Amino acid sequence: RRFLDRGGRWLAIHGAAAYIEFKGPEVEIGGITLPGLTDTPDRQPDYMDLLGCRFVSHLAPQEIAIESVSDHEIVRGLQPLAVVDEPYILEIRGDCEVLLSSRYTGEAPGYVEGPWLEDVPRPQALLHRRGLGETLYLAPGHCVGPYDLRPFIDELPAHPGPWANPAYRELLRRAIRWGTG
């Protein structure tokens, strides 16, 4: 909190906005047995307030079309992105400037919250100001290694997600430059 209040910049990516718990009996989703439905209770409100958002749920991984909705230096002139990722549903906290947005609707398999059927803009990158500082949060960023879901499944196919996309890597370069500038 003091870091941001004094002018610090914090770059947070993808799962940084998530706090999850499993609820209820075991459930099988896509061949993977989970210890229950995934719940995202608001148990870390101070942290989420610093971040500017809270992860609520996500749709099944799919291609997401993302476009700039701001003239901020981080996204100015950035080509539209089409990335394979988990389409995140976020709860915005506080005064945030949305930099990138997308639209999607659908089921949220394995989650307590959902389905998400309202066709509304979904933030993909946002800037949250606090004190003299700022937090930049990027929702895309899911990648899968072969052993990432142990102990739920022994091995699964690796997938780089948006990290394989040159436009996403350019966004990351800009975000890092912003964070260190």
Feature map (PLM): residue ranges:
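Short glycine-/acidic-enriched loop or helix-start segments at secondary-structure transitions
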Residues: I20-K23, G110, Y147-D148
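A glycine-rich, often tryptophan-bearing local segment used as a flexible ligand/cofactor-contacting loop or short
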Residues: R1-G77
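Short amphipathic alpha-helical segments and helix-helix/interface helices
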Residues: R1-L4, I89, A125, I176
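Short, surface-exposed, polar/charged, turn-prone segments marking secondary-structure boundaries
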Residues: E26, I32, T38-P41, G94-D95, ...
